[in-house]
């Protein structure tokens, strides 16, 4: 397939239009060397191509790749591919956010500027899959680029992966993580629990709290549920219901958000599962 160059970013990255008139950002060693806009290139020299979901994202990626070494982009692409194998489809913005983060993390490390991650402990426990991928990402960066980033970066990379699965940014992920931690603490103290983090009920609770936290921070809510079912849960699981109501009061005071009775019901069900294990 032949592609027409529309913009040369550097010797290794160009923007093209393919035969179907789709805009793409393509990479390949020396692919833009002594080339001009309007010329055509053969796909045999392309090592990687990106056709992101919008012209805006393609533009942001083009700007980013114009000043990032090919090796760094290729390394981040490998990390993203690995993440998508494990987590499923990620938002296209991950190509921009994670690559930009890793490039600056490498620069900070080379300048001996270390950025602590205050949420590292929480990220490890609340997002174990993403945290493991973050650990593997550091190994990939070390092997490919010869840079041994500190463990705090595991947490930052994991947060980018969490963000790419949802419709938020890093600030949103930090807010969700903080709210999840607070709710887990409230449940733990009410029932004097020692969480069994490998148990299915705990993992279900964490998953529920993650999506509940996103809904709370985005002013969304589940409202569609049978009132008789709510009453049944309240009667059958009175302790869990009371705990869920206390969490609703806390969120109202701390975040000025109102939780619907349906949300309280689903939260109580998940709390009861964990409480029963204790």
From Swiss-Prot:
Ranges in coiled-coil conformation: none
SMART domains xref list: CAT_RBD
Residue intervals passing through the bilayer: none
GO molecular function, one term: RNA binding
UniProt-listed InterPro entries: BglG_antiterminators, CAT_RNA-bd_dom, CAT_RNA-bd_dom_sf, PRD, PRD_sf, Transcrpt_antitermin_CS
Biological processes per GO annotation: positive regulation of DNA-templated transcription
SUPFAM superfamilies, alphabetized: PTS-regulatory domain, PRD, SacY-like RNA-binding domain
Domain PRD: 67-171, 172-278
PTM characteristics: Phosphorylated and inactivated by BglF (eII-bgl). The degree of phosphorylation is dependent on the presence or absence of beta-glucosides which act as inducers of the operon expression. Addition of inducer result in the rapid dephosphorylation of BglG.
Alphabetic keyword roster: Activator, Phosphoprotein, Repeat, RNA-binding, Transcription, Transcription regulation
Family as reported in the entry's similarity comment: Belongs to the transcriptional antiterminator BglG family.
Role summary: Mediates the positive regulation of the beta-glucoside (bgl) operon by functioning as a transcriptional antiterminator. This is an RNA-binding protein that recognizes a specific sequence located just upstream of two termination sites within the operon.
NCBIfam families listed in its UniProt record: LicT, PRK09772.1
UniProt-recorded name of the protein: Cryptic beta-glucoside bgl operon antiterminator
Organism: Escherichia coli (strain K12)
């Amino acid at each position: 397939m032949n592609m027409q160059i529309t913009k040369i970013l550097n010797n290794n990255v160009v923007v093209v239009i393919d035969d179907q008139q789709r805009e793409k950002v393509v990479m390949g060693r020396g692919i833009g060397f002594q080339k001009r806009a309007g010329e055509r290139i053969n796909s045999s020299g392309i090592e990687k191509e990106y056709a992101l979901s919008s012209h805006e994202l393609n533009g942001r990626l083009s700007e980013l790749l114009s000043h990032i070494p090919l090796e760094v982009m290729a390394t981040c692409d490998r990390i993203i591919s690995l993440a998508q194998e494990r987590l499923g489809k990620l938002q296209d913005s991950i190509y921009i956010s994670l690559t930009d983060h890793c490039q600056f993390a490498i620069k900070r490390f080379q300048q001996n500027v270390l950025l602590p991650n205050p949420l590292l402990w929480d990220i490890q426990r609340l997002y174990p899959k993403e945290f493991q991928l973050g650990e593997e990402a550091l190994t990939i960066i070390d092997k490919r680029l010869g840079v041994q980033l500190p463990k705090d970066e595991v947490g930052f990379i994991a947060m980018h992966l969490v963000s790419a699965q949802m419709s938020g940014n890093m600030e949103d992920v930090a807010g969700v993580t903080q709210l999840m931690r607070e709710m887990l603490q409230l449940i733990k103290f009410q029932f004097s629990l020692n969480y069994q983090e490998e148990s299915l009920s705990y993992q279900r609770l964490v998953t529920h709290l993650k999506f509940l936290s996103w809904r709370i921070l985005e002013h969304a809510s589940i409202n569609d549920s049978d009132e008789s079912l709510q009453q049944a849960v309240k009667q059958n699981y009175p302790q869990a219901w009371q705990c869920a109501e206390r969490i609703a009061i806390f969120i109202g005071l701390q975040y000025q958000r109102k939780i619907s009775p349906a949300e309280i019901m689903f939260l109580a069900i998940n709390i009861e599962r964990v409480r029963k294990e204790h």
